[in-house]
Curated annotation (Swiss-Prot):
Keyword entries, A-Z: Cytoplasm, Lipid biosynthesis, Lipid metabolism, Magnesium, Metal-binding, Phospholipid biosynthesis, Phospholipid metabolism, Transferase
Enzyme Commission numbers on file: 2.5.1.41
Protein's UniProt name: Geranylgeranylglyceryl phosphate synthase
Cofactor: Mg(2+)
Highest taxon of source: Archaea
Length: 245
């Protein structure tokens, strides 16, 4: 078990709910401000940083972002929209399959292209099934995904069972960056009830109430990004709500 995976698993086994801060390098205009935000988020209690974005991220931007985030001492994990997000300055990468994509590229070709780079960079891999729930977001458009019917959590469960059967350890339920609505609580609930997957939930989480509800329903890790960019102090209330769960 790698260092980052061990860090996450031990926290979850100790009964903790985790918070990951998502940083999109394409939206970083001031590296000094990014460092201030990162320090704030670490002080607020975030457990790790994710680096990623659906569009426009260069390896250079990802690298500069990772170097700043690592100053906090927290794990820095690549959340790749594509192989352009890979950087040797991170600690680990969510090695993802976009499970409900119609594109072969996101089902296996991207992983094949990324594998030798990840080996070269000596990044720890966290095998992750990535499922985009809604259809009206940038990630759904880029990834050409089939939306998951909100009223049919059993369809999601079939995806997660398939993920578990092929050896995936993490499942990431994505509403989409800036989504007007979060993942429904019934989704992490059914994953937690019927699988042993570590469940990550992100997108549309803009209030402490929603974050707490998702964590109570079964999410092990809550991811926020847009709210961190807009109002880091509000993000602190989300972290507190998760940690008090």
């Amino acid at each position: 078990m790698g260092k980052v995976n061990k860090y996450i698993v031990e926290k979850i086994n100790n009964g903790e709910k985790l918070h990951f801060t998502l940083i999109d390098p394409d939206r970083v205009n001031d590296l000094g401000k990014l460092e201030e935000t990162a320090i704030k988020m670490a002080e607020f209690g975030t457990d790790a940083f994710l680096i990623g974005g659906s569009l426009g991220v260069t390896p250079e931007e990802a690298g500069e972002t990772a170097k700043i985030l690592k100053k906090t001492g927290l794990p820095v994990i690549i959340f790749p929209g594509n192989i352009n997000c890979l950087t040797p300055y991170a600690d680990a990468v969510l090695f993802m399959i976009l499970m409900n994509s119609m594109e072969q590229y996101y089902l296996m070709h991207a992983q094949i292209a990324a594998a030798p780079i990840i080996k070269k960079y000596k990044l720890e891999t966290l095998p992750t099934g990535y499922i985009v729930i809604y259809g009206e977001t940038a990630v759904a458009h880029v990834g050409r995904t089939y939306p998951i019917p909100v009223s049919k959590p059993e369809i999601l469960l079939s995806y997660t069972w398939a993920a578990e059967m092929i050896g995936i350890k993490y499942i990431y339920l994505e509403a989409g960056s800036g989504s007007p609505k979060p993942v429904p609580p019934s989704f992490p609930a059914i994953v937690k009830k019927y699988t042993n997957l570590i469940t990550i939930v992100g997108g549309g989480i803009r209030s402490p109430f929603i974050a707490k509800e998702l964590a109570s329903s079964g999410a092990d890790i809550i991811v926020t990004g847009t709210i961190v960019e807009e109002d880091p102090d509000k993000a602190s209330k989300i972290i507190s709500a998760i940690k008090k769960n």
